[in-house]
């Protein structure tokens, strides 16, 4: 797994997602949320296009650490200056690719709060991971509703 090879385990992704978990119809427990999130994460990473987007963020992070990004000094990279928005664009693209506008909404929640591993990652990888977790979280909530018992009107 390209993420694990770069220090971000599946467990870290799940734990990060669960820090902002809230009870929702069909997702009454964190255990159920973790199970659905993990399943949705596996589905997302089965898509080579997502893996390539993630890999591009990994490469950008490596180049930033080395100070070899075009028109961006190593010092500016390390400060994660606000005029650099490519990292946010990549994170939003990942979340939107996974789950459309719902994913972008969740991306913003995770990007602002920086739970779990997000607070420990560099300027590109925090947004890549926020995009993954945001998109997959949005799908988790949607999947939970879709899998509810249709005969139970008290679900919603």
Please describe what each predicted stretch is.
Residues 1-55:
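N-terminal interaction modules that seed assembly of large macromolecular complexes
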Residues 5, 15, 42, 47, ...:
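Acidic-enriched, low-complexity/disordered segments with a strong bias for Aspartate over Glutamate
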Residues 6, 26, 30, 34, ...:
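Intrinsic-disorder-associated interaction segments
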Residues 7, 26, 57, 64-67, ...:
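Residue-identity detector for glycine
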Residues 15-22, 53-55, 86-96, 131-138:
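Short, hydrophobic/amphipathic alpha-helical patches that form generic packing surfaces
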Residues 31-32, 55, 59, 146, ...:
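Residue-level signal for alpha-helical context at structural boundaries
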Residues 32-107:
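Long, charge-patterned amphipathic interaction tracts in eukaryotic proteins
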Residues 98-156:
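Glycine-rich, aromatic-bearing surface loops/beta-hairpins
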């Amino acid at each position: 797994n390209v993420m694990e090879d770069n220090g971000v385990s599946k467990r870290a992704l799940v734990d990060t997602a669960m820090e902002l978990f809230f009870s929702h119809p069909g997702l009454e427990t964190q255990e159920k949320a973790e199970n659905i999130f993990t399943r949705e994460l596996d589905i997302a990473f089965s898509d080579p296009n997502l893996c390539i987007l993630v890999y591009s963020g990994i490469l950008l992070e490596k180049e930033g650490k080395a100070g070899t990004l075009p028109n961006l000094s190593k010092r500016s990279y390390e400060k994660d200056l606000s005029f650099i928005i490519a990292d946010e664009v990549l994170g939003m693209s990942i979340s939107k690719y996974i789950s459309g506008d719902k994913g972008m909404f969740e991306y913003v929640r995770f990007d602002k709060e920086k739970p779990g591993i997000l607070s420990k990652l560099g300027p590109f990888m925090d947004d890549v991971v926020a995009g993954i977790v945001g998109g997959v979280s949005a799908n988790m909530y949607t999947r939970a509703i879709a899998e509810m018992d249709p005969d139970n009107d008290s679900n919603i």
